[in-house]
UniProtKB/Swiss-Prot annotation:
Lineage: Bacteria, Bacillati, Cyanobacteriota, Cyanophyceae, Synechococcales
Keywords, in A-Z order: Ribonucleoprotein, Ribosomal protein, RNA-binding, rRNA-binding
Listed InterPro entries: Ribosomal_uS4, Ribosomal_uS4_bac-type, Ribosomal_uS4_CS, Ribosomal_uS4_N, S4_RNA-bd, S4_RNA-bd_sf
UniProt keyword Oxidoreductase, yes or no: no
Domain S4 RNA-binding: 90-152
Name listed for the protein in its UniProt record: Small ribosomal subunit protein uS4
Highest taxon in the source lineage: Bacteria
């Protein structure tokens, strides 16, 4: 399953608010599809699937990528669910989003893919790069790159930069100072249900 490129509001109507995917909110309260039908009680599988889809669409990863992250999270010490969220939060495109360099994760991914972002002083165009403590994320030294980011950083997608990121707004740089705490994940998600979803699949 590839990365989603369809209407974003259609997804948020079905799954709820996804701050990484879009800043817009749907004016329609009903989920997409036919209406007026009696709502059936959802199965446990359907609930787990929905939580998994929230992660996929919010962070903009493919099913194949998410499976790899789940395997990696399992291999690490500690809670698999927390490890999974941290792996997704540490993606370069997401770090750029949390710093305010891009208004959404897709917007931040475009900045990375087009060579506007640096890691430790070198241009890096790999959106899925796993940022680590001590990494300094910056913007390429040219007018076009800086102009793109300066417009975004004045109106960031999320109001607050999490405490594990140290933003130097005038210099357009951010340093990773530690691990992302669970409470600072900007998505309403039950990560344990995601882990359960993959328990028999991975």
């Amino acid at each position: 399953m590839s990365r989603y490129r369809g209407p974003r509001l259609r997804v948020t109507r079905r799954l709820g608010e996804l701050p990484g995917l879009t800043r817009k909110a749907s004016k329609k309260s009903n989920p997409p599809g036919q209406h007026g039908q009696a709502r059936r009680k959802r199965s446990e599988y359907a609930i787990r699937l929905e939580e998994k889809q929230k992660l996929r669409f919010n962070y903009g990863v493919s099913e194949k990528q998410l499976v790899r992250y789940v395997k990696k999270a399992r291999a690490q010490e500690g809670s698999t669910g927390t490890n999974l969220l941290r792996l997704l939060e540490n993606r370069l495109d997401n770090v750029c989003f949390r710093l305010g360099f891009g208004g959404t994760i897709p917007g931040s991914r475009q900045l990375v893919n087009h060579g506007h972002v640096t890691v430790n002083g070198k241009v890096l165009d790999i959106a899925g790069y796993q940022c680590k403590s001590g990494d300094v994320i910056g913007i390429k030294e040219n007018k076009a790159s800086k102009k793109l980011v300066e417009g975004n950083i004045e109106f960031p997608g999320l109001a607050n930069v999490p405490p594990h990121l140290d933003l130097d707004k005038p210099k357009l740089t951010g340093k990773i100072t530690g691990k992302c705490d669970r409470e600072w994940v900007a998505l309403e998600i039950n990560e344990l249900l995601v882990v359960e979803y993959y328990s028999r699949k991975v």
